[in-house]
Amino acid sequence: MSKNHQDPPKAKSRSVSAKKKRRRRKKRQRRILMSITLILLFVIGFGSFYAYTMLSGINHDKISKNKTELGIYKENINALKKYKTYNKVINIALFGLDQRSENEPSRSDAVMIVSIDKANKKIKLTSVMRDSYVAIDGHGNDKLTHAYAYGGPELSIKTLNENFNLNITDYAAVNFFDMEKIIDSLGGVTLDIKQYEVKEINKYIKEIADITKTPYTPLAGAGSQTLTGRQALSYTRIRSVGNGDFERTSRQRIVLEALLGKIKEGGILSLPKNISKLAPMVRTSLGTGEMIKMGLSLFLSGTTEIETARIPVDGTFPDGGKMIKGTWYLPFDKEKNIEYLHEYIYEDVHPNK
């Protein structure tokens, strides 16, 4: 009987002991979580400081934050908000500038919309044809490329927003002559050169050599090969062979894609070195803090795929463009291209497939 009377206290003792163990385990888990949190905060803090140092060489430009001045209107924003992914996409204007000397005005030789799509884990590069016939505030209808010469990045952003009902508030720009240095600093890019492109590439290599008063070194021949910065830059400038300006914008996207691929290929350890090299050659309206936040967001979302497209879409403009008052333009069906562009950016429906 005495044994039976002693059983309940043993069960109670085991219960108390188990509770103590659970409390100790929870405390230990909390300590581990706190330690991990402190380590993460330290890494983020140190990483942010390091990132600020790396990005300090970038040239920052202030542009208007007034949405109306940038061509962003309430009715357009409301139309974009119907897309479920609206808050997961950031659109930035990217300009490739053709400025051969500091005293010469900049012209946007390449115009792209970079869409950071965290919903589909993609970076989308959409080329907008430079000769697209668009409305430019204060200048009537003209070629898209002229907006930058008329009013710099601010007017170019406004032109994109007003003609394509977008919400772009920031831009990044690279002078094509700096692009040569960027590509060389990364060890060149591998491209497949067609036979009919060789002569044209060498023509532009010669032109650049004459402008910069440097030796002329022509490309030897066609085929897959690693191009220097000057050779790759000359490749992007070809427009008189193949499918003219359409193929030219395709070449620009190919080089940019190869360049981004090269940076990715280097891995995270070589990223600081590469960013430090590239920073002085970039102009942007984005602040350093904004860029760090964007980069961290990209990293955490696992956004790695790069995809390209082109606007206007085939079938929405007259073949070969159109002469208007003695000048060649590319008029296009605006409503259809707005629809194609929005569906691509926000619904991941590729317009060129």
Q: What does each model-identified segment do?
A:
Residues 108-110, 141, 145, 153-161, ...:
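Extracytoplasmic/secreted envelope proteins and their assembly/folding machinery
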Residues 87-90, 106-111, 120-128, 139, ...:
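Extracytoplasmic
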Residues 75-81, 94-101, 107-112, 146-161, ...:
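N-terminal post-signal-peptidase region of extra-cytosolic proteins
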Residues 184-270, 351-352:
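Flexible, polar/acidic helix-loop-strand segments at domain edges
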Residues 2-8, 26-120, 313:
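Entry/capping segment at the start of metal-dependent catalytic domains
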Residues 99-103, 142-150, 165-170, 222, ...:
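Second-shell loop/turn segments in exported
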Residues 72-82, 88, 101, 135, ...:
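C-terminal solvent-exposed extensions
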Residues 147-214, 287:
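Amphipathic, coiled-coil-like alpha-helical scaffolding segments used for oligomerization/assembly
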